[in-house]
């Protein structure tokens, strides 16, 4: 099969400047000119880590599975969605208080818990939903479910009211619904993992790895072509689709027959064409590798009319990407990072918060990292 992608645009890796050990509060990390564009530079300063252990209970329900995070400027709190599939408790999101200032991250605590409702106004039945992302939009709370490829349950993006009730649903583009023969559509557990809202109100939704018709999952030697759908946030109608080139798996498992993977686990809009993306990898016997990438969609091809990227002969320009941060490389030991938000500390400090999905596993933890944003791309 023939794939014509403009390789030079696929991945630009520029090393960050590191001022100190990442375990030191105040250590700084700078990517000055990603893509050769110094107006897109980003600088971060480490503010610390806070952990909530697996098994922590809130309102009689186990806390965990944090897969999305977004700052609410009106309250100064963060919304965090759990990927509990209405099994340990109802599908839900939390309002969190993140206590930090320029001196560091002090604590993360639950302010309240809100149950998400289906179209009939009822809590979701068990295994009928898989919440993975959450953002505040202009008319409510935007959240995504990645569906269930095995059960042929389609992914979706919906808008909820503050009380969790259903408001409306975005249109699912052709080619994303799961199929029994796996010829097209989402792969199980690799679907709508990512959600971002741009200043214009446009909404970006990404799949963790390639749709079946677009090619294979990442391997140790090759990457994967993830689609990002751009929606009109006001109407929920798709406007365009882009290709994000997920990197090859960066680390082999400890044993030849053990598992490993890599995928795009979250995106965050910096402006209307630049986003941050989390590439989250796991290798059995090694752990997680977490890299924060900046992507630029300015010259990316709209591939919404291309049914299969694997069988396409047209020239396609994917999103450009440049590495901003490698958490292991700066001395951190990240868990399963799936949540990312910009926000503000109580003293007005601009911050970037990362959060992990503990999979409700006793061998994992709910982990939050905080960074002060010293500089970010200018439009």
Give a label for each model feature.
Residues 1-20:
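Gram-negative bacterial Sec-dependent N-terminal signal peptides
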